[in-house]
Protein backbone atom coordinates (compact mmCIF):
# COMPACT_ATOMS: atom_id res chain seq x y z
CA UNK A 1 0.00 0.00 0.00
CA UNK A 2 1.39 3.39 -0.93
CA UNK A 3 2.15 5.73 1.93
CA UNK A 4 1.45 9.46 2.04
CA UNK A 5 -1.40 9.62 -0.50
CA UNK A 6 -3.89 9.62 2.34
CA UNK A 7 -3.23 13.27 3.14
CA UNK A 8 -4.82 14.23 -0.19
CA UNK A 9 -7.55 11.66 -0.72
CA UNK A 10 -9.84 9.40 1.21
CA UNK A 11 -11.48 6.18 0.05
CA UNK A 12 -15.25 6.05 0.00
CA UNK A 13 -16.43 2.48 -0.50
CA UNK A 14 -19.66 1.87 -2.42
CA UNK A 15 -21.94 -1.13 -2.74
CA UNK A 16 -20.20 -2.83 -5.66
CA UNK A 17 -16.96 -3.09 -3.71
CA UNK A 18 -15.15 -0.38 -5.61
CA UNK A 19 -14.36 3.10 -4.41
CA UNK A 20 -14.27 6.65 -5.59
CA UNK A 21 -11.65 9.20 -4.65
CA UNK A 22 -12.73 12.47 -3.12
CA UNK A 23 -10.56 15.34 -1.98
CA UNK A 24 -10.35 15.42 1.81
CA UNK A 25 -11.56 18.57 3.49
CA UNK A 26 -8.91 20.59 5.33
CA UNK A 27 -9.03 23.26 8.00
CA UNK A 28 -9.65 26.66 6.50
CA UNK A 29 -7.02 28.33 8.68
CA UNK A 30 -4.19 27.58 11.05
CA UNK A 31 -6.08 29.37 13.84
CA UNK A 32 -9.04 27.08 13.24
CA UNK A 33 -6.91 23.98 13.74
CA UNK A 34 -5.33 25.34 16.92
CA UNK A 35 -8.62 26.45 18.48
CA UNK A 36 -10.52 23.27 17.56
CA UNK A 37 -7.72 21.05 18.89
CA UNK A 38 -7.41 23.18 22.02
CA UNK A 39 -11.18 22.94 22.44
CA UNK A 40 -10.82 19.17 22.52
CA UNK A 41 -7.99 19.37 25.06
CA UNK A 42 -9.66 21.96 27.31
CA UNK A 43 -11.90 19.88 29.52
CA UNK A 44 -13.57 19.91 32.89
CA UNK A 45 -10.41 18.74 34.66
CA UNK A 46 -8.83 22.10 33.83
CA UNK A 47 -11.46 23.75 36.02
CA UNK A 48 -12.60 21.36 38.71
CA UNK A 49 -9.28 19.67 39.41
CA UNK A 50 -6.19 21.62 38.35
CA UNK A 51 -6.61 24.75 40.55
CA UNK A 52 -7.19 22.64 43.66
CA UNK A 53 -4.30 20.21 43.18
CA UNK A 54 -2.06 23.12 42.26
CA UNK A 55 -2.78 24.93 45.52
CA UNK A 56 -2.54 21.75 47.61
CA UNK A 57 0.77 20.72 46.03
CA UNK A 58 2.84 23.83 46.52
CA UNK A 59 1.43 26.45 44.16
CA UNK A 60 3.93 27.75 41.63
CA UNK A 61 6.37 24.96 42.49
CA UNK A 62 3.76 22.45 41.34
CA UNK A 63 3.13 24.45 38.16
CA UNK A 64 6.81 24.19 37.24
CA UNK A 65 6.79 20.41 37.78
CA UNK A 66 3.56 20.18 35.79
CA UNK A 67 5.04 22.13 32.87
CA UNK A 68 8.04 19.78 32.81
CA UNK A 69 5.73 16.78 32.48
CA UNK A 70 3.68 18.50 29.79
CA UNK A 71 6.92 18.84 27.84
CA UNK A 72 8.23 15.30 28.35
CA UNK A 73 4.91 13.42 28.40
CA UNK A 74 2.04 15.32 26.79
CA UNK A 75 4.02 16.94 23.96
CA UNK A 76 5.53 13.82 22.32
CA UNK A 77 2.27 11.86 22.56
CA UNK A 78 0.32 14.71 20.98
CA UNK A 79 2.95 14.95 18.23
CA UNK A 80 2.63 11.22 17.56
CA UNK A 81 -1.15 11.38 17.30
CA UNK A 82 -1.23 14.47 15.08
CA UNK A 83 1.48 13.08 12.81
CA UNK A 84 -0.27 9.75 12.26
CA UNK A 85 -3.34 11.71 11.21
CA UNK A 86 -1.54 14.04 8.82
CA UNK A 87 0.71 11.33 7.41
CA UNK A 88 -2.18 9.02 6.59
CA UNK A 89 -4.75 11.67 5.75
CA UNK A 90 -7.32 9.51 7.50
CA UNK A 91 -8.93 9.01 10.86
CA UNK A 92 -8.14 6.06 13.08
CA UNK A 93 -10.38 3.79 10.98
CA UNK A 94 -7.81 3.72 8.14
CA UNK A 95 -4.71 5.49 9.46
CA UNK A 96 -2.85 2.46 10.82
CA UNK A 97 -3.32 0.28 7.74
CA UNK A 98 -2.31 3.21 5.53
CA UNK A 99 1.05 3.53 7.30
CA UNK A 100 1.81 0.15 8.89
CA UNK A 101 4.36 -2.36 7.62
CA UNK A 102 2.89 -5.20 5.56
CA UNK A 103 2.06 -8.24 7.69
CA UNK A 104 1.63 -6.33 10.98
CA UNK A 105 -1.54 -6.05 13.03
CA UNK A 106 -1.58 -2.38 13.99
CA UNK A 107 -4.86 -1.79 12.14
CA UNK A 108 -6.71 -3.72 14.87
CA UNK A 109 -6.03 -0.79 17.20
CA UNK A 110 -8.58 1.33 15.33
CA UNK A 111 -11.20 -0.18 17.63
CA UNK A 112 -9.49 1.39 20.66
CA UNK A 113 -10.24 4.80 19.16
CA UNK A 114 -13.91 4.27 18.41
CA UNK A 115 -14.67 2.37 21.63
CA UNK A 116 -12.86 5.02 23.68
CA UNK A 117 -14.77 7.82 21.97
CA UNK A 118 -18.13 6.19 22.62
CA UNK A 119 -17.44 5.39 26.28
CA UNK A 120 -16.12 8.90 26.93
CA UNK A 121 -19.21 10.46 25.39
CA UNK A 122 -21.48 8.05 27.32
CA UNK A 123 -20.94 10.21 30.42
CA UNK A 124 -19.44 13.43 29.04
CA UNK A 125 -22.66 14.36 27.23
CA UNK A 126 -24.48 14.07 30.54
CA UNK A 127 -21.97 16.34 32.28
CA UNK A 128 -22.19 18.83 29.40
CA UNK A 129 -25.94 18.79 30.03
CA UNK A 130 -25.28 19.65 33.68
CA UNK A 131 -23.35 22.74 32.56
CA UNK A 132 -26.14 23.88 30.26
CA UNK A 133 -28.73 23.27 32.98
CA UNK A 134 -26.81 25.33 35.55
CA UNK A 135 -26.21 28.11 33.01
CA UNK A 136 -29.98 28.25 32.55
CA UNK A 137 -30.63 28.15 36.31
CA UNK A 138 -28.18 30.97 36.99
CA UNK A 139 -29.61 33.05 34.13
CA UNK A 140 -33.20 32.47 35.26
CA UNK A 141 -32.36 33.39 38.86
CA UNK A 142 -33.71 30.13 40.30
CA UNK A 143 -30.55 29.68 42.39
CA UNK A 144 -30.49 33.26 43.67
CA UNK A 145 -31.17 33.73 47.37
CA UNK A 146 -30.88 30.05 48.27
CA UNK A 147 -29.18 29.08 51.51
CA UNK A 148 -26.06 26.86 51.31
CA UNK A 149 -28.03 23.73 52.24
CA UNK A 150 -30.59 24.57 49.57
CA UNK A 151 -27.88 25.00 46.91
CA UNK A 152 -26.44 21.62 47.88
CA UNK A 153 -29.93 20.16 47.81
CA UNK A 154 -30.53 21.60 44.33
CA UNK A 155 -27.61 19.58 42.95
CA UNK A 156 -28.81 16.45 44.72
CA UNK A 157 -32.31 17.01 43.39
CA UNK A 158 -31.00 17.24 39.84
CA UNK A 159 -29.12 13.95 40.24
CA UNK A 160 -32.27 12.27 41.54
CA UNK A 161 -34.32 13.37 38.52
CA UNK A 162 -33.50 11.24 35.45
CA UNK A 163 -35.98 13.22 33.35
CA UNK A 164 -34.22 16.54 33.93
CA UNK A 165 -30.76 15.11 33.27
CA UNK A 166 -31.94 13.26 30.17
CA UNK A 167 -33.49 16.38 28.65
CA UNK A 168 -30.32 18.43 29.09
CA UNK A 169 -28.11 15.55 27.93
CA UNK A 170 -30.22 15.37 24.76
CA UNK A 171 -29.80 19.13 24.28
CA UNK A 172 -26.00 18.70 24.49
CA UNK A 173 -26.08 15.79 22.01
CA UNK A 174 -28.29 17.62 19.51
CA UNK A 175 -26.29 20.86 19.70
CA UNK A 176 -22.99 19.05 19.16
CA UNK A 177 -24.15 16.81 16.32
CA UNK A 178 -25.89 19.85 14.82
CA UNK A 179 -22.49 21.52 14.56
CA UNK A 180 -20.79 18.41 13.13
CA UNK A 181 -23.42 17.78 10.44
CA UNK A 182 -22.51 21.12 8.84
CA UNK A 183 -19.06 19.79 7.95
CA UNK A 184 -15.50 20.56 9.02
CA UNK A 185 -15.05 24.17 7.88
CA UNK A 186 -18.67 25.38 7.99
CA UNK A 187 -19.54 23.56 11.21
CA UNK A 188 -16.79 22.26 13.48
CA UNK A 189 -14.17 24.89 12.65
CA UNK A 190 -16.42 27.93 12.28
CA UNK A 191 -18.53 27.39 15.39
CA UNK A 192 -15.76 26.07 17.64
CA UNK A 193 -13.63 29.11 16.78
CA UNK A 194 -16.43 31.38 17.99
CA UNK A 195 -17.00 29.27 21.12
CA UNK A 196 -13.30 29.22 22.00
CA UNK A 197 -12.94 32.96 21.40
CA UNK A 198 -15.89 33.64 23.71
CA UNK A 199 -14.50 31.13 26.22
CA UNK A 200 -11.16 32.96 26.34
CA UNK A 201 -12.87 36.34 26.72
CA UNK A 202 -15.13 35.04 29.50
CA UNK A 203 -12.29 33.40 31.38
CA UNK A 204 -10.21 36.59 31.38
CA UNK A 205 -13.17 38.74 32.50
CA UNK A 206 -14.10 36.27 35.25
CA UNK A 207 -10.49 36.03 36.44
CA UNK A 208 -10.09 39.82 36.62
CA UNK A 209 -13.33 40.06 38.58
CA UNK A 210 -12.17 37.43 41.10
CA UNK A 211 -8.80 39.10 41.53
CA UNK A 212 -10.36 42.40 42.65
CA UNK A 213 -12.57 40.80 45.32
CA UNK A 214 -11.70 41.57 48.97
CA UNK A 215 -9.03 39.22 50.37
CA UNK A 216 -8.44 37.72 46.92
CA UNK A 217 -4.70 38.20 47.43
CA UNK A 218 -4.70 35.37 49.99
CA UNK A 219 -6.13 33.08 47.35
CA UNK A 220 -3.46 34.14 44.87
CA UNK A 221 -0.77 33.33 47.45
CA UNK A 222 -2.26 29.88 48.07
CA UNK A 223 -2.48 29.27 44.33
CA UNK A 224 0.71 30.75 42.93
CA UNK A 225 3.33 31.42 45.60
CA UNK A 226 5.77 28.48 45.88
CA UNK A 227 5.05 26.61 49.10
CA UNK A 228 7.81 24.13 49.88
CA UNK A 229 6.17 23.25 53.20
CA UNK A 230 3.13 21.95 51.30
CA UNK A 231 5.39 19.77 49.18
CA UNK A 232 7.16 18.45 52.28
CA UNK A 233 3.89 17.65 54.03
CA UNK A 234 2.54 15.70 51.06
CA UNK A 235 5.86 14.23 50.04
CA UNK A 236 7.75 14.92 46.83
CA UNK A 237 6.67 11.61 45.28
CA UNK A 238 2.89 12.24 45.45
CA UNK A 239 3.37 15.82 44.21
CA UNK A 240 5.39 14.64 41.22
CA UNK A 241 2.87 11.94 40.43
CA UNK A 242 -0.06 14.38 40.62
CA UNK A 243 1.76 16.64 38.16
CA UNK A 244 2.59 13.72 35.88
CA UNK A 245 -0.91 12.26 35.77
CA UNK A 246 -2.64 15.60 35.22
CA UNK A 247 -0.18 16.47 32.44
CA UNK A 248 -1.00 13.13 30.84
CA UNK A 249 -4.79 13.32 31.05
CA UNK A 250 -5.32 17.02 30.36
CA UNK A 251 -4.65 16.88 26.61
CA UNK A 252 -7.25 14.24 25.62
CA UNK A 253 -4.67 12.14 23.78
CA UNK A 254 -4.97 8.42 23.13
CA UNK A 255 -8.41 7.85 21.60
CA UNK A 256 -7.83 9.44 18.21
CA UNK A 257 -9.65 12.73 18.82
CA UNK A 258 -6.43 14.61 18.07
CA UNK A 259 -5.48 12.21 15.27
CA UNK A 260 -8.56 13.08 13.24
CA UNK A 261 -7.70 16.79 13.35
CA UNK A 262 -4.18 15.92 12.21
CA UNK A 263 -5.75 14.30 9.15
CA UNK A 264 -7.37 17.65 8.28
CA UNK A 265 -4.09 19.55 8.74
CA UNK A 266 -2.08 21.10 5.92
CA UNK A 267 1.67 20.51 5.62
CA UNK A 268 2.89 24.10 5.80
CA UNK A 269 3.74 23.93 9.54
CA UNK A 270 5.64 21.38 11.62
CA UNK A 271 3.65 19.22 14.00
CA UNK A 272 5.86 20.14 16.97
CA UNK A 273 5.21 23.85 16.62
CA UNK A 274 1.45 23.38 16.42
CA UNK A 275 1.45 21.00 19.40
CA UNK A 276 3.27 23.61 21.51
CA UNK A 277 0.62 26.22 20.69
CA UNK A 278 -2.22 23.90 21.71
CA UNK A 279 -0.49 22.88 24.95
CA UNK A 280 0.15 26.53 25.85
CA UNK A 281 -3.50 27.40 25.24
CA UNK A 282 -4.71 24.46 27.33
CA UNK A 283 -2.33 25.47 30.14
CA UNK A 284 -3.49 29.09 29.95
CA UNK A 285 -7.11 28.01 30.45
CA UNK A 286 -6.16 25.78 33.39
CA UNK A 287 -4.18 28.55 35.10
CA UNK A 288 -6.86 31.18 34.49
CA UNK A 289 -9.53 28.85 35.89
CA UNK A 290 -7.54 28.87 39.10
CA UNK A 291 -7.54 32.67 39.15
CA UNK A 292 -11.33 32.54 38.90
CA UNK A 293 -11.98 29.93 41.57
CA UNK A 294 -9.29 30.15 44.27
CA UNK A 295 -9.39 33.94 44.98
CA UNK A 296 -13.21 33.83 45.03
CA UNK A 297 -13.16 30.99 47.56
CA UNK A 298 -10.76 32.88 49.82
CA UNK A 299 -12.72 36.12 49.42
CA UNK A 300 -15.82 34.47 50.89
CA UNK A 301 -14.07 32.19 53.39
CA UNK A 302 -14.92 28.97 51.56
CA UNK A 303 -12.47 26.08 51.39
CA UNK A 304 -11.58 25.42 47.74
CA UNK A 305 -12.33 21.86 46.76
CA UNK A 306 -12.34 19.76 43.63
CA UNK A 307 -14.77 17.82 41.48
CA UNK A 308 -18.48 18.39 40.81
CA UNK A 309 -19.15 19.71 44.32
CA UNK A 310 -16.83 22.66 43.58
CA UNK A 311 -18.77 23.64 40.46
CA UNK A 312 -22.32 22.90 41.50
CA UNK A 313 -22.31 23.61 45.24
CA UNK A 314 -19.34 25.76 46.29
CA UNK A 315 -19.34 28.25 43.41
CA UNK A 316 -23.13 28.83 43.25
CA UNK A 317 -23.01 29.64 46.97
CA UNK A 318 -20.25 32.15 46.29
CA UNK A 319 -22.19 33.73 43.43
CA UNK A 320 -25.21 34.11 45.75
CA UNK A 321 -23.12 36.28 48.10
CA UNK A 322 -21.49 38.29 45.34
CA UNK A 323 -22.66 41.64 43.97
CA UNK A 324 -24.09 40.90 40.54
CA UNK A 325 -23.77 37.22 41.34
CA UNK A 326 -26.49 36.18 38.92
CA UNK A 327 -24.57 37.74 36.04
CA UNK A 328 -21.22 36.28 37.11
CA UNK A 329 -22.76 32.87 37.77
CA UNK A 330 -24.35 32.82 34.33
CA UNK A 331 -21.09 33.88 32.69
CA UNK A 332 -19.18 31.15 34.54
CA UNK A 333 -21.52 28.34 33.52
CA UNK A 334 -21.67 29.61 29.94
CA UNK A 335 -17.87 29.37 29.98
CA UNK A 336 -18.10 25.84 31.37
CA UNK A 337 -20.71 24.92 28.75
CA UNK A 338 -18.37 26.07 25.99
CA UNK A 339 -15.51 24.05 27.52
CA UNK A 340 -17.65 20.91 27.70
CA UNK A 341 -19.32 21.28 24.30
CA UNK A 342 -16.03 21.97 22.49
CA UNK A 343 -14.80 18.58 23.71
CA UNK A 344 -18.06 16.83 22.78
CA UNK A 345 -17.99 18.33 19.28
CA UNK A 346 -14.37 17.24 18.78
CA UNK A 347 -15.01 13.65 19.86
CA UNK A 348 -18.24 13.47 17.83
CA UNK A 349 -16.20 14.54 14.79
CA UNK A 350 -13.83 11.64 15.47
CA UNK A 351 -16.78 9.23 15.58
CA UNK A 352 -18.28 10.63 12.37
CA UNK A 353 -14.97 10.50 10.49
CA UNK A 354 -14.47 6.88 11.62
CA UNK A 355 -17.51 5.70 9.66
CA UNK A 356 -16.87 8.01 6.71
CA UNK A 357 -13.35 6.62 6.31
CA UNK A 358 -14.24 3.01 7.11
CA UNK A 359 -17.44 2.60 5.09
CA UNK A 360 -17.77 5.68 2.91
CA UNK A 361 -21.04 6.74 4.53
CA UNK A 362 -22.17 10.34 4.10
CA UNK A 363 -21.77 12.72 7.01
CA UNK A 364 -25.54 13.19 7.32
CA UNK A 365 -26.15 9.44 7.42
CA UNK A 366 -23.54 8.92 10.14
CA UNK A 367 -24.96 11.76 12.24
CA UNK A 368 -28.52 10.47 11.87
CA UNK A 369 -27.50 7.00 13.01
CA UNK A 370 -25.43 8.22 15.92
CA UNK A 371 -27.85 10.74 17.44
CA UNK A 372 -30.24 8.09 18.73
CA UNK A 373 -27.43 5.68 19.59
CA UNK A 374 -25.56 8.32 21.62
CA UNK A 375 -28.68 9.29 23.56
CA UNK A 376 -29.32 5.64 24.44
CA UNK A 377 -25.65 5.09 25.29
CA UNK A 378 -25.73 8.05 27.71
CA UNK A 379 -28.79 6.86 29.62
CA UNK A 380 -26.96 4.38 31.93
CA UNK A 381 -24.79 7.20 33.33
CA UNK A 382 -27.92 9.29 33.93
CA UNK A 383 -29.75 6.41 35.63
CA UNK A 384 -26.66 5.53 37.67
CA UNK A 385 -27.41 8.45 40.01
CA UNK A 386 -31.01 7.44 40.68
CA UNK A 387 -32.80 4.36 39.30
CA UNK A 388 -29.59 2.30 39.11
CA UNK A 389 -27.82 3.85 42.12
CA UNK A 390 -27.59 0.47 43.86
CA UNK A 391 -25.37 -0.79 41.03
CA UNK A 392 -21.85 0.08 42.20
CA UNK A 393 -19.58 -1.51 39.57
CA UNK A 394 -16.10 -0.73 40.88
CA UNK A 395 -16.71 -0.81 44.61
CA UNK A 396 -18.95 0.72 47.28
CA UNK A 397 -20.01 4.27 46.51
CA UNK A 398 -19.14 4.06 42.82
CA UNK A 399 -21.55 4.81 39.98
CA UNK A 400 -21.90 3.86 36.33
CA UNK A 401 -20.24 7.16 35.45
CA UNK A 402 -17.28 6.18 37.65
CA UNK A 403 -16.96 2.91 35.74
CA UNK A 404 -17.07 4.68 32.37
CA UNK A 405 -14.57 7.29 33.55
CA UNK A 406 -12.29 4.50 34.82
CA UNK A 407 -12.46 2.65 31.50
CA UNK A 408 -11.50 5.77 29.57
CA UNK A 409 -9.12 7.61 31.91
CA UNK A 410 -7.24 4.64 33.35
CA UNK A 411 -7.38 2.28 30.37
CA UNK A 412 -8.13 3.62 26.90
CA UNK A 413 -6.29 6.96 27.21
CA UNK A 414 -2.97 5.53 28.48
CA UNK A 415 -3.15 2.39 26.35
CA UNK A 416 -4.15 4.40 23.28
CA UNK A 417 -1.26 6.80 23.90
CA UNK A 418 1.09 3.82 24.17
CA UNK A 419 -0.18 2.52 20.83
CA UNK A 420 0.49 5.81 19.03
CA UNK A 421 3.99 6.13 20.52
CA UNK A 422 4.98 2.54 19.69
CA UNK A 423 3.52 2.81 16.19
CA UNK A 424 5.64 5.89 15.48
CA UNK A 425 8.88 4.33 16.76
CA UNK A 426 8.78 0.60 15.95
CA UNK A 427 10.04 -0.69 12.60
CA UNK A 428 7.02 -2.91 12.04
CA UNK A 429 4.78 0.11 12.63
CA UNK A 430 5.29 3.37 10.80
CA UNK A 431 8.85 3.65 12.06
CA UNK A 432 10.85 6.57 13.40
CA UNK A 433 12.11 7.78 10.02
CA UNK A 434 8.65 8.05 8.49
CA UNK A 435 7.22 9.64 11.63
CA UNK A 436 9.98 12.24 12.02
CA UNK A 437 9.98 13.15 8.33
CA UNK A 438 6.24 13.84 8.39
CA UNK A 439 6.32 15.65 11.74
CA UNK A 440 9.10 17.99 10.59
CA UNK A 441 7.54 18.96 7.26
CA UNK A 442 6.79 22.67 7.05
CA UNK A 443 7.94 25.78 8.90
CA UNK A 444 8.56 25.67 12.62
CA UNK A 445 10.59 23.80 15.25
CA UNK A 446 11.73 20.31 14.25
CA UNK A 447 11.79 17.14 16.33
CA UNK A 448 15.47 16.29 17.00
CA UNK A 449 16.99 12.89 16.23
CA UNK A 450 17.95 12.34 19.89
CA UNK A 451 14.25 12.19 20.75
CA UNK A 452 14.17 8.73 19.14
CA UNK A 453 15.65 6.91 22.14
CA UNK A 454 13.40 8.75 24.57
CA UNK A 455 10.20 8.03 22.64
CA UNK A 456 11.19 4.43 21.94
CA UNK A 457 12.06 3.37 25.49
CA UNK A 458 11.67 5.98 28.23
CA UNK A 459 8.27 7.40 27.25
CA UNK A 460 6.58 3.97 27.03
CA UNK A 461 7.98 3.15 30.48
CA UNK A 462 6.50 6.36 31.91
CA UNK A 463 3.12 5.54 30.36
CA UNK A 464 3.23 2.07 31.94
CA UNK A 465 3.91 3.65 35.35
CA UNK A 466 0.99 6.09 34.95
CA UNK A 467 -1.27 3.26 33.81
CA UNK A 468 -0.46 0.85 36.65
CA UNK A 469 -0.48 3.59 39.30
CA UNK A 470 -3.98 4.55 38.15
CA UNK A 471 -5.17 1.01 38.81
CA UNK A 472 -3.40 0.92 42.16
CA UNK A 473 -4.93 4.18 43.36
CA UNK A 474 -8.40 3.11 42.23
CA UNK A 475 -8.43 -0.26 44.02
CA UNK A 476 -5.91 -0.01 46.88
CA UNK A 477 -8.61 0.67 49.49
CA UNK A 478 -10.97 -2.05 48.29
CA UNK A 479 -9.07 -5.03 49.71
CA UNK A 480 -5.99 -7.01 48.72
CA UNK A 481 -7.89 -9.59 46.67
CA UNK A 482 -9.70 -6.88 44.74
CA UNK A 483 -6.45 -5.00 44.11
CA UNK A 484 -4.46 -8.05 42.99
CA UNK A 485 -7.19 -9.19 40.62
CA UNK A 486 -7.46 -5.84 38.90
CA UNK A 487 -3.67 -5.39 38.72
CA UNK A 488 -3.41 -8.77 36.98
CA UNK A 489 -6.09 -7.64 34.54
CA UNK A 490 -4.13 -4.43 33.86
CA UNK A 491 -0.96 -6.40 33.15
CA UNK A 492 -2.83 -8.72 30.77
CA UNK A 493 -4.03 -5.70 28.77
CA UNK A 494 -0.47 -4.39 28.60
CA UNK A 495 0.84 -7.73 27.36
CA UNK A 496 -1.88 -7.81 24.70
CA UNK A 497 -0.86 -4.35 23.48
CA UNK A 498 2.82 -5.29 23.25
CA UNK A 499 1.97 -8.62 21.65
CA UNK A 500 -0.02 -7.04 18.82
CA UNK A 501 2.54 -4.25 18.45
CA UNK A 502 5.37 -6.74 17.95
CA UNK A 503 3.49 -9.14 15.67
CA UNK A 504 4.64 -9.52 12.08
CA UNK A 505 4.24 -12.41 9.68
CA UNK A 506 7.58 -14.05 8.95
CA UNK A 507 6.95 -14.08 5.21
CA UNK A 508 5.88 -10.44 5.08
Residues of each region from the PLM?
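C-terminal membrane-solvent junction of multi-pass transporters and transport-like membrane proteins
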Residues: 108-116, 361-371, 407-467, 479-484, ...
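Membrane-water interface regions at transmembrane-helix termini and the short interhelical loops
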Residues: 53-57, 105-121, 156-160, 171-195, ...
Amino acid sequence: MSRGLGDVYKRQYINDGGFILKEREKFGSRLGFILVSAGCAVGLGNVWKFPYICGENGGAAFVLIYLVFLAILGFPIMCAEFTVGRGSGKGAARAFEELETKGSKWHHFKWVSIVGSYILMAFYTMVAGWMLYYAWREASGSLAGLEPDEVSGAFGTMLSQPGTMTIWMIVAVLLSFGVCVLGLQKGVEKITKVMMALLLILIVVLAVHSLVLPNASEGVKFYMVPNLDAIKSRGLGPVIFDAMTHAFFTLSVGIGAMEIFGSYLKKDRTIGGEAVNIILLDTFVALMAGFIIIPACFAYGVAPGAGPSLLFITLPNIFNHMAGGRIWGTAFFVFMSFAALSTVIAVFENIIAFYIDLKGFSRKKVVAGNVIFMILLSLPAVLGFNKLATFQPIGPGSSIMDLEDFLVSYNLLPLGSMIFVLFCTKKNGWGWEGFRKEANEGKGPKLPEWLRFYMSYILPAIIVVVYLKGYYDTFKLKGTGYLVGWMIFACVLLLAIFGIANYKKKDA
